[in-house]
Design a protein with these regions (language model features):
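Thiamine diphosphate
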Residues: 1-112, 122
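Flexible, low-complexity linker and terminal segments
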Residues: 93-218
Length: 218
């Protein structure tokens, strides 16, 4: 079926809606969800949405369910490289609380940068449970300075995906939108040092569910 492609195209439309002169709302949050095979299927539609970009009052989030042990899938899956190829900054939660926190960061980053963002949910997290803090004050999201050479970097979604304009859009993704994403990550301490040791000689980096497995093994 074409559900995945239609869903991604609808999310693209949600980001363009706020740019219309008769828009009723400042922006719309668009969220796409699919397992790894759905991401494979919807790649072209998502790529077009990424190029068009996200609204500063909306935000576009791609949530992908990965099943690395093929627990309920025909083949094992890991979507990291596919998401990277689609120019989607990747948030990888390790538990249910992480999924809520990083999901909020992903939407906030999308609004601040004009990028679509992604959230990778592995089977262990999707099937997991836990007590979570849902207070709206749990996160203090910081929107960093987005000026370059004194000019504000505000992205306006654009569906003119034809030459030569599409080449300008690709340049904007790599030179402007990615820079915004780096500033967001730094300002919000997204990549944390969780066991600070002043005299450390060796560091270990891990993400998502594997982070908790590494901590447990140590």
């Amino acid at each position: 079926n074409v559900n995945e492609e239609l869903g991604a195209t609808a999310v693209m439309g949600s980001q363009l809606a706020g740019e219309q002169p008769d828009a009723k709302y400042d922006g719309v949050v668009g969220i796409w969800f699919g397992k790894a095979p759905g991401l494979d299927r919807a790649g072209d539609a998502i790529r077009h949405g990424v190029y068009a970009g996200a609204s500063q009052h909306g935000g576009a989030l791609v949530i992908v369910g990965d099943d690395p042990a093929a627990k309920s899938s025909t083949v094992p899956s890991s979507s990291d490289l596919a998401l990277m190829d689609l120019h989607l900054p990747l948030f990888y939660p390790g538990d249910v609380q992480d999924a809520l926190d990083l999901g909020r960061h992903a939407i906030a980053m999308s609004r601040a940068t004009g990028l679509w963002t992604s959230l990778k949910i592995v089977a262990a997290v999707a099937d997991g449970s836990g007590t979570v803090d849902v207070s709206p004050d749990r996160l203090s999201i910081v929107i960093p300075d987005m000026h370059v050479d004194g000019a504000p970097l505000i992205h306006h979604p654009d569906s003119r995906l034809l030459p030569p304009h599409n080449l300008d859009i690709e340049r904007d993704i790599h030179t402007v939108r990615f820079e915004r994403a780096r500033r967001y990550v730094a300002a919000n301490d997204v990549n944390r040092i969780t066991v600070p040791t002043p005299d450390a000689r060796i560091g270990m980096a891990s993400t998502g569910a594997k982070y908790h497995e590494v901590r447990e093994s140590l």
